[in-house]
């Protein structure tokens, strides 16, 4: 079997449990159904305090620096953020402010977000996509937005949301060629 893809998923929520973490895990699980991956999950809540107190990358503790290096070396990056006041969180943005300017050039990024209602769904295209375009990453054409109504007990509970997650994962497969795709027996 081929070398697994290094998939790094950043769950941008700061609490646990969280719908953002649940969505991130559901996306990783679906990607694993279609691609041979080695997943790495970064929970922003676990590094938020030391991350937030650093103005410069050189001020980060080594454990947080390691997480940033994982992001920079990803073959595929999955980013999921809760939506607050129409945008991603400040800690989420601060993490990407500390990522090397050219570190994500041509890195495929699957965008995802959670929000209280569908009125936040445009955050994918109006907030996240411009951020990663600036970083010259390759944002995947299908993102995943999950509203509060589509999740129950911190799990995907909507067939429509599950279908969007599946579509996003399926659309990621061609980027990595047949040697990373998992063969499904009929």
From Swiss-Prot:
Pfam families: FMN_red. SUPFAM superfamilies: Flavoproteins. It catalyses: FMNH2 + NAD(+) = FMN + NADH + 2 H(+). Induction: Under sulfate limitation conditions, it is transcriptionally activated by the LysR-type transcriptional regulator, CysB. Its EC number is 1.5.1.42. InterPro entries: Flavoprotein-like_sf, FMN_Rdtase-like_dom, FMN_Rdtase_MsuE-like, NAD(P)H-dep_FMN_reductase. GO terms for molecular function: FMN reductase (NADH) activity; oxidoreductase activity, acting on NAD(P)H, quinone or similar compound as acceptor. Keywords: Flavoprotein, FMN, NAD, Oxidoreductase. NCBIfam families: FMN_reduc_MsuE (TIGR03566). Belongs to the SsuE family. Involved in the dimethyl sulfide degradation pathway. Catalyzes the NADH-dependent reduction of FMN. This is NADH-dependent FMN reductase SfnE. It comes from Pseudomonas putida. The gene is sfnE.
């Amino acid at each position: 079997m081929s070398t697994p893809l290094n998939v790094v998923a950043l769950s941008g929520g700061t609490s646990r449990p969280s719908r953002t973490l649940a969505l991130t895990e559901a996306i990783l699980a679906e990607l694993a159904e279609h691609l041979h991956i080695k997943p790495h999950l970064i929970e922003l809540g676990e590094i938020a305090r030391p991350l937030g107190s650093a103005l410069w990358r050189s001020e980060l503790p080594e454990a947080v620096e390691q997480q940033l290096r994982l992001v920079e070396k990803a073959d595929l990056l999955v980013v999921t953020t809760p939506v607050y006041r129409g945008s991603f969180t400040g800690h989420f943005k601060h993490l990407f402010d500390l990522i090397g300017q050219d570190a994500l050039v041509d890195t495929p990024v699957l965008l995802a977000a959670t929000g209280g209602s569908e009125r936040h769904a445009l955050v994918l295209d109006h907030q996240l996509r411009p951020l990663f375009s600036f970083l010259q990453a390759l944002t995947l054409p299908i993102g995943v937005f999950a509203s509060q109504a589509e999740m129950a007990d911190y799990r995907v509970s909507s067939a429509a949301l599950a279908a969007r997650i599946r579509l996003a994962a399926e659309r990621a497969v061609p980027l990595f060629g047949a040697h990373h795709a998992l063969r499904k027996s009929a």
